[in-house]
Amino acid sequence: MMRGNSFKAVNIKVVGLVVTCLVFSPTALSERLYAQTTPTDKMDAVMSAGYQKVWNKEVQARIDRDIRTYRMADATLQFAGSVNRKGVRIEQVSHDFLFGSNTFLWGDCHSPHNDSIYSNTFGTLFNAATIAFYWRDLEPTKGQPRFAAGSPYIHRRPAPDPIVAFMNRHNVNINGHCIIYGQPFAIPAWMPDSRLQMDSLFKAHIQELASRYTDKIQRWDVVNECYDQVNRHLMPDDYTFRCYQWANAFFPKSVSLNMNECDMHWPTTDINHYVEIARNLLFRGARINNLGIQSHIMSTDEMEQMAEGTIRYLTPEHIWANLQALSKAERPIYISEVTVCAPDSTPRGLAIQAAVTRDLYRIYFSHPNVRGITWWNMVDHGGFKGEPLYSGIYDVDMRPKPVYHVLDTLIHQEWTTRLTQAPDKNGELHFRGFKGRYRITWTDKKGHRHESFIHLDKDGAFQL
């Protein structure tokens, strides 16, 4: 993949591409786009020689090779009838890999127009969404959960029902975050200080979520950040294991149950401890389908260190070592929460954010056991108190930032297969494409148009 040239070519066409993706008028969008989309050469120009040394040509070549090896598959199309020699149109219409963001500012972007931009990012740029289910804010008053539209307002905690309905209509994969979170700020204020009483309340809470959403939500972070057992709230005995037992009993088997933990900054020894917690739970019979790991760059100073190439962590070697360690749990990996903050809102700061994001997404996408990546706060100034101001892919006025265009280019251009190709002399057509669903269209020799769909998830032949 030509990292240096592909993004420059996109700049000429980027407005048209965004209009194609998003369901807004061209006029409205063109007025809101940044004047500069920061092509790759400009992003590279703000990154130091030290950064370029860390993310060198050999590293990039290895990432390219691994993406081609692990994210693509060979397809053979076999046609029952004749095919016009003008060729067959092959268009990828969806990805197996999940690219998402949280939905914490749903309906809270200061105008209906901005809210529309926010919501319509799902099903266009992103095919996955993380919806907030923090118990303390979901049920601030015991027995009065805030599920439905019109529930009392809490910042960054929108009522989940309307979001679930939207995502289901648009075939967006949903992750519920999170059922149980042991930190004091996440447990309902009305929770009794009795392990025994908490036990029955936890069980009932999990059962209520399973009953209400059944398979409408495809993935759940059952227990969030269970690694730290020192600074947590009073919790029921063996609560992590028991929560997975209850979730397994109440949710359909089609629903995936996740663990979620901090952070890719950790030394690999700490990642190994997380893996051992997961393996011990699995050994005892817990159903854990996926392992989540967070990747937050919350410090502007850290971003400057990234740009200088002096940071100790989040180097290609460190990232790969941690992903390999996580793989020892023998479960798919989700990069569950990604924050890449800009050092500031200057063109240089935005270019640094875009460049770091490009490299992090590429290496995460290249690992065979990673199944999805979720951007955390989609809008600047939209984070939790104390989190960085410039960590969005949109600014506060919902204008796409350079990092937005980086993600759009990676997901919908570099990592999407579209081609027109004629069958060989045997009537077969061979191609290698990114894993996902495809629309195949062709015309036979009598001029009749045909359309078929295939799901390419591994090497295989398809009879059309």
Where are these regions (language model features)?
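Substrate-binding cleft/loops of secretory-pathway carbohydrate-active enzymes
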Residues: 114, 263-288, 352
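Active-site beta-loop-alpha junctions enriched in small/polar residues
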Residues: 102-106, 134, 179-181, 222-225, ...
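Beta-strand-rich domain onsets/edges
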Residues: 36-108, 140-141, 147, 175, ...
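Short Pro-Gly-centered beta-turn/loop motif in secreted/extracellular proteins
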Residues: 110-125, 429-437
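Aromatic-rich peripheral "rim/lid" segments of glycoside hydrolase catalytic domains that contact
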Residues: 39-58, 212, 226, 230-233, ...
